[in-house]
């Protein structure tokens, strides 16, 4: 007997091993393999540890079962969908066929209603709807910049907010995807770094961002040519390598040729330098790598990217040199935010060239003008200073384009993402208090 009181929203109860049913939200459901894995995980402890340069931060374990008792199928691999169907009572042969059909409808057609799945028997539509869900993150707010950049404020089932951004260009469209609610890294120039880490996003919440963007852009089915969403960058809120398993599982679904079908060559994962996870990311995910470098000396990088105190520049660059699949055709991108009188001198530019050459890295450098946000301690380098820096790096044989800021007017530019729902709520409360006071007067 596994005796464990589960304290996660509506879940309560104790479950005997080998039972085919479990109590959830006051109802009895068949216990699928996915549910068992979640509940048995609670036997060990209901909180997981995220590694970091500061004391580890506890976050709730992600569950695949919704508060209504249905199993969420978004973010579950095809074999997992088949297992869920079998656990719900379908014969293995039929479960395999239905899993293939459901996968196609979810990721190729963008359908979230079983009743619209025309190649599945109508008699099974209600049965599936009662047991399974195909959902999207809730959209709290959508904004469009004057330059066409779009930003969405999204909300999880447990009322945590995060953001994603779509950046259109003439020849491509890039979706900036978040991996966590908040962040542990505390990078001094980044607005997200001023938030506390709330929790990791689940595979469903990561894949759901891509699906929402496709919804907004009208880009179903997935295989159509000429689509606007062509690239994905894991550069939104959070450190992807501190949520490695969920990011990996989500990107495998995004890259699946029978589903969302984005090539791994069009996906970039950005890290601030979680050195122990970089090789594993190359082997298990295999997408392009971007590194938030931002400084070339220990003193400056320790200040603005505190993870450098744990994994220094030399360790980081060696991990880049060892990254599987990096070559001149798939260069590593170094992100370098330009901060006035902090990291923007000619000497800094020359040291950057020296470091890249020393480690023989197939690399390019993206120079990012600092995007201001309220309370920041830094200023953006002057345009002529940025051009001088770029010219020195170019002269060293390394591509160093200057990124054009996008979405600044809606706080969607690099380093500006931070959910504003808490601030808005306080403003609303203040407004209500003023109205009440006026009424009393």
Residue map of PLM features:
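Cationic, low-complexity basic patches in intrinsically disordered or flexible, solvent-exposed regions
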Residues: 4, 34-37
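Generic detector of N-terminal low-structure segments
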Residues: 26, 31, 40-41
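Auxiliary Fe-S-binding modules of radical SAM enzymes
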Residues: 37-162, 218, 224, 321-329, ...
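Generic beta-strand structural signal
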Residues: 150, 162, 173-177, 185, ...
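Canonical Radical SAM [4Fe-4S] cluster-binding loop centered on the CxxxCxxC motif
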Residues: 168-215, 219
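Conserved AdoMet/S-adenosylmethionine-binding subsite of the radical SAM
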Residues: 215-396
């Amino acid at each position: 007997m596994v005796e464990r009181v589960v304290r996660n929203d509506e879940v309560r109860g104790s479950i005997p091993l080998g039972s085919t049913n479990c109590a959830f939200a006051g109802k009895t459901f068949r216990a699928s393999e996915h549910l068992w894995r979640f509940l048995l995980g609670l036997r060990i402890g209901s909180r997981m540890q995220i590694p970091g340069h500061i004391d580890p931060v506890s976050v709730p374990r992600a569950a695949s079962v919704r508060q209504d008792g249905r199993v969420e199928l978004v973010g579950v691999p095809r074999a997992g969908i088949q297992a869920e169907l079998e656990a719900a009572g379908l014969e293995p042969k039929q479960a395999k066929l239905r899993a293939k059909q459901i996968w196609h409808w979810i990721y190729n057609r963008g359908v979230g209603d079983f009743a619209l799945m025309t190649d599945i028997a109508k008699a099974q539509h209600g049965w599936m709807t009662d047991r399974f869900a195909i959902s999207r993150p809730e959209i709290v707010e959508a904004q469009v910049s004057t330059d066409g950049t779009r930003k969405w404020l999204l909300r999880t089932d447990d009322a945590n907010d995060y953001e994603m951004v779509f950046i259109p260009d003439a020849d491509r469209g890039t979706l900036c995807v978040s991996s966590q609610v908040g962040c542990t890294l505390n990078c001094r120039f980044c607005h997200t770094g001023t938030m506390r880490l709330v929790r990791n996003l689940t595979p469903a919440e990561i894949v759901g961002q891509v699906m929402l963007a496709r919804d907004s852009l009208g880009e179903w089915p997935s295989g159509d040519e000429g689509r606007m969403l062509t690239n994905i960058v894991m550069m939104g809120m959070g450190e992807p390598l501190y949520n490695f398993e969920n990011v990996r599982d989500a990107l495998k679904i995004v890259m699946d040729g029978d589903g969302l079908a984005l090539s791994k060559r069009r996906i970039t994962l950005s890290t601030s330098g979680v050195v122990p996870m970089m090789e594993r990311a190359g082997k298990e995910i295999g997408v392009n790598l971007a590194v938030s470098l931002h400084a070339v000396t220990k003193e400056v990088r320790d200040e603005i990217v505190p993870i450098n105190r744990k994994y220094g520049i030399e360790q980081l660059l060696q991990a880049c040199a060892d990254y599987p699949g990096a070559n001149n055709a798939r260069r590593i991108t170094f992100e370098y935010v330009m901060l006035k009188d902090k990291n923007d001198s000619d000497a800094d530019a020359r040291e950057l060239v020296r470091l890249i050459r020393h480690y023989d890295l197939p690399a390019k450098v993206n120079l990012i003008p600092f995007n201001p946000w309220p309370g920041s301690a830094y200023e953006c380098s002057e345009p002529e200073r940025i051009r001088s820096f770029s010219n020195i790096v170019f002269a060293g044989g390394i591509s160093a384009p200057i990124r054009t800021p996008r979405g600044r007017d809606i706080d969607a530019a690099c380093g500006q993402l931070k959910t504003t729902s808490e601030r808005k709520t306080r403003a609303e409360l203040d407004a209500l208090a003023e109205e009440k006071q006026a009424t009393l007067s």
